[in-house]
Amino acid sequence: MKDYLVKALAFDGEVRAYSVRTTNTVSEAQRRHDTWRTASAALGRSLTAGTMMGAMLKGEQKLTIKVEGNGPIGPILVDAHANGDVRGYVTNPHVDFEGTEQGKLRVYQAVGTEGFVTVIKDIGMREPFIGQSPIVSGELGEDFTYYFAVSEQTPSSVGVGVLVNGDDSILAAGGFILQIMPGAQDETISFIEDRLQKIPPVSTLIEQGLSPEELLYAVLGEDKVKVLETMDVQFNCTCSRERIESVLISLGKTELEQVREEEEETEVHCHFCNERYKFSKEDITNLIENL
């Protein structure tokens, strides 16, 4: 099954809902960064939340998420675009902890329970929108829920889950975001709160193979949900050799000549996708000649 996202309304417009399958997306991130189990879960949850938050934007708009906790995984960075493209990395990919007796990964131990979630939105204005909230649990779903309440004043519920196999490969990943719209009835809010208490964890639902639509039906009730739009999502980095060449050219002739003099081979590393671009002395000479 391909990865895709669903945008929906529920309860006659009282609730805005997003749901996504990100199994392939998180698998690609795990492959590129060689993340261990707990790091994969943390990065995967962040990518899943970022994908849905990106889908709230329009056109060429994009956002960056920084999760900066006090745990050994270090900062997590995610870039997400309105078109479904997402990329991201963890600072320390080789972090893992023993799971609970129920097999649940201890993501909070990797992320830490103190720190901040920062969201930077580039929505075409002169200055980006920057929102920040403290980490409240380190499990990330709760932390993004709190972010929406504090920074965007939008009562929300964020559920994100990643299942990791014993060999570090990704079994399943996905999640949902529910947002209460202004004027929603108390009965609607109570109904959703009750459902959220009763449904299995997100990771259990996605392990059962539920589609994004079925995930929303499980949370809200099939008769309450109206699907508005679906779109493909994927791990996609914007870096390329041409872009890196442009960055090198921007250094100017003097600095490029110094690089050519000092290095047999110049390597530029993209943290987001772990791609490495190598430039020989001849490559650098060609760049200088094109200035």
Curated annotation (Swiss-Prot):
Q: Which GO terms describe its molecular function?
A: protein folding chaperone; unfolded protein binding
Description of post-translational modifications: Under oxidizing conditions two disulfide bonds are formed involving the reactive cysteines. Under reducing conditions zinc is bound to the reactive cysteines and the protein is inactive.
Give a GO cellular-component term.
Answer: cytoplasm
Disulfide bond positions: 237-239, 270-273
Keywords of the record: Chaperone, Cytoplasm, Disulfide bond, Redox-active center, Zinc
Task performed by this protein = Redox regulated molecular chaperone. Protects both thermally unfolding and oxidatively damaged proteins from irreversible aggregation. Plays an important role in the bacterial defense system toward oxidative stress.
Checking PANTHER family in the record gives: 33 KDA CHAPERONIN (PTHR30111:SF1)
Full protein name: 33 kDa chaperonin
Please name the source species: Bacillus cereus (strain ATCC 14579 / DSM 31 / CCUG 7414 / JCM 2152 / NBRC 15305 / NCIMB 9373 / NCTC 2599 / NRRL B-3711)
Taxon lineage: Bacteria, Bacillati, Bacillota, Bacilli, Bacillales
What gene is this protein translated from? hslO
